[in-house]
Amino acid sequence: MHIMEGFLPGIWALVWFVVAIPVISYGALKTARLARNDELNKSHIAVAAAFIFVLSALKIPSVTGSTSHPTGTGIAVVLFGPAVTAFLSAIVLLYQALLLGHGGLTTLGANVVSMGVVGPVAGWVVFRALNPYLDLQKATFAAAVIADWTTYLVTSIQLGVAFPSGPGVAGVVDSIVRFASVFSITQIPIGIVEGALAAGLIGYIAMSRQSIKTRLGVTA
């Protein structure tokens, strides 16, 4: 879903930066506070960031100007919530834009909004809704899958409003549907695989520190 450098019109690039910056700033403050309060949080933050980096770097060419890949945000969402996930995603996306040619600086705001903000919020809502009823791994699986799929829905919206297929709302909606249809071919199975990976990793992390289940409000 990394929209490449220079692909979005300037006005839309600016809009997404304006949306992303406050969330990233709040996430940075929350991440710093968590790291200060608990030494083990530092290692878990590092693991969550590494999971985002590794999975989101596995790109497959997709819609013109974008790619398909896992997002890797599920672990961060479950452990720390959407604000921290937004900050970690922004760091990863900036690094990838500067050093890997993946995404871009002008499109960084748009990429953060889709992968670091809206997708994680959707995943977090799903996790909070399910964790009283499912075990930790199943709730994490669902959260990671929904975060992934929502990310690509948002990217489709970003591309659709920037490049409508025709005049008016109908042209925007048609363009969004077209982008989402192409993404879905690869992203539906990718999201399911990502959910399985996230579930496996969260299970391993929980085994190393049983108190995580209590903090997250799960019993199994």
From Swiss-Prot:
Protein name, entry field: Putative cobalt transport protein CbiM
Domain of life, per lineage: Archaea
Database matches in Gene3D superfamilies: 1.10.1760.20
Protein family according to the UniProt entry: Belongs to the CbiM family.
Pathway membership, UniProt: Cofactor biosynthesis; adenosylcobalamin biosynthesis
UniProt KW keywords: Cell membrane, Cobalamin biosynthesis, Cobalt, Cobalt transport, Ion transport, Membrane, Transmembrane, Transmembrane helix, Transport
Protein function: Part of the energy-coupling factor (ECF) transporter complex CbiMNOQ involved in cobalt import.
Biological process per Gene Ontology, one example term: cobalamin biosynthetic process
GO molecular function terms listed in the Swiss-Prot or TrEMBL record: cobalt ion transmembrane transporter activity
Membrane topology: Multi-pass membrane protein
GO cellular component terms, semicolon-separated: ATP-binding cassette (ABC) transporter complex
Pfam family for this entry, one: CbiM
Subunit field text: Forms an energy-coupling factor (ECF) transporter complex composed of an ATP-binding protein (A component, CbiO), a transmembrane protein (T component, CbiQ) and 2 possible substrate-capture proteins (S components, CbiM and CbiN) of unknown stoichimetry.
Localization, UniProt: Cell membrane
Gene: cbiM
Transmembrane segments: 6-26, 45-65, 74-94, 107-127, 153-173, 188-208
Broad class of the protein's primary localization: membrane
